[in-house]
Amino acid sequence: MSDSLIDLLLEVGKALIVLVGIVGAGAFMSFIERRLLALWQDRYGPNRVGPFGLLQLAADMIKMFFKEDWIPPFADRRIFILAPIIAFTAFILAFAVVPLTPTWGVADLNVGLLYILAIAGLAVYAVLFAGWSSNNKYSLLGSLRASAQTLSYEVFLGLSLMGIVIQTGSFNLRDIVEAQAGLWNVVPQILGFITFLFAGVAVTHRHPFDQPEAEQELADGYHIEYAGMKWGLFFVGEYIGIVLISSLIVTLFFGGWHGPWLPPFIWFALKTACFMVFFILLRASLPRPRFDQVMSFGWKVCLPLTLVNMLITGAVVLINVQ
């Protein structure tokens, strides 16, 4: 067996391990969320299936797998099927350039940051396709909300990272992590971090920015007509998006795998888990604002913060160069 074939098989195996880990983390987060919400709300939560309810996730997956794969007769069948597939795969593909350790990662692209923004932006097509193809007024309204919110906050998501690019001079995520060996980016880029955090919550449609899926207003929004595994793909895709945003926060602002004593991957996993729990805490503690308030907050607060952050970072870098 040639060396090139061995290298190819190793890369494929590495990609499969990352894929299984990401999907597993996203699925397991749904169980952790239910347990934590129950703890904070002084109730039991899932505790019937397996010890401490640990098999509840497997029971939910089996239930979704055997539910009827129903497609409304008035729906656009092809687009209706395509939407959850895009929603599930977009965030997974974005993980290809996230470095987990100094030597472990699927791909090492010099334009890794641009790749993530481009691939993650494909998720908005899944929302539009789901709302349009369902031929349901609530689904369409939810998809229009989601597309407007996602497209707006993706602007702030990208601009909030430009300070890091100016500071490090690279779009490569591995270079950005290595540049944080002495000082994490969250200190000089605190404005960028705050904006990225808000934008990440909005792009993943998580509470309190879950207006596209507001049950009280839109009856679950753009996936109201979905059931079974198609709904499951949307469901798991949302949690994978949370894992992606959490890992990006760690990679870009909190030093990635850097940390004392423990192995690099353990540090990366612990930091990512902390922000995943933070996402759950937001759901448990904050009310849902109106949709116009969400959009106004983005354009009137997040956009000025990103521009000020870029100006300050550019001025500091220019002064240091001179």
Curated annotation (Swiss-Prot):
GO BP annotations listed: aerobic respiration
UniProt keyword annotations, A-Z: Cell inner membrane, Cell membrane, Membrane, NAD, Quinone, Translocase, Transmembrane, Transmembrane helix, Ubiquinone
EC number: 7.1.1.-
Reaction catalysed by this enzyme: a quinone + NADH + 5 H(+)(in) = a quinol + NAD(+) + 4 H(+)(out)
InterPro entries: NADH_UbQ_OxRdtase_su1/FPO, NADH_UbQ_OxRdtase_su1_CS
Keyword Transmembrane helix: yes
Key word Transmembrane helix present: yes
Subcellular location per the Swiss-Prot or TrEMBL entry: Cell inner membrane
Transmembrane segments: 12-32, 79-99, 111-131, 151-171, 183-203, 234-254, 262-282, 301-321
Record-linked Pfam families: NADHdh (PF00146)
Topology in membrane: Multi-pass membrane protein
One term of GO molecular function: oxidoreductase activity, acting on NAD(P)H, quinone or similar compound as acceptor
One GO cellular component, as annotated: plasma membrane
Function: NDH-1 shuttles electrons from NADH, via FMN and iron-sulfur (Fe-S) centers, to quinones in the respiratory chain. The immediate electron acceptor for the enzyme in this species is believed to be ubiquinone. Couples the redox reaction to proton translocation (for every two electrons transferred, four hydrogen ions are translocated across the cytoplasmic membrane), and thus conserves the redox energy in a proton gradient. This subunit may bind ubiquinone.
Subunit description: NDH-1 is composed of 14 different subunits. Subunits NuoA, H, J, K, L, M, N constitute the membrane sector of the complex.
Family from the record: Belongs to the complex I subunit 1 family.
HAMAP family linked: NDH1_NuoH
Protein name as it appears in the record: NADH-quinone oxidoreductase subunit H
Gene name of this polypeptide: nuoH
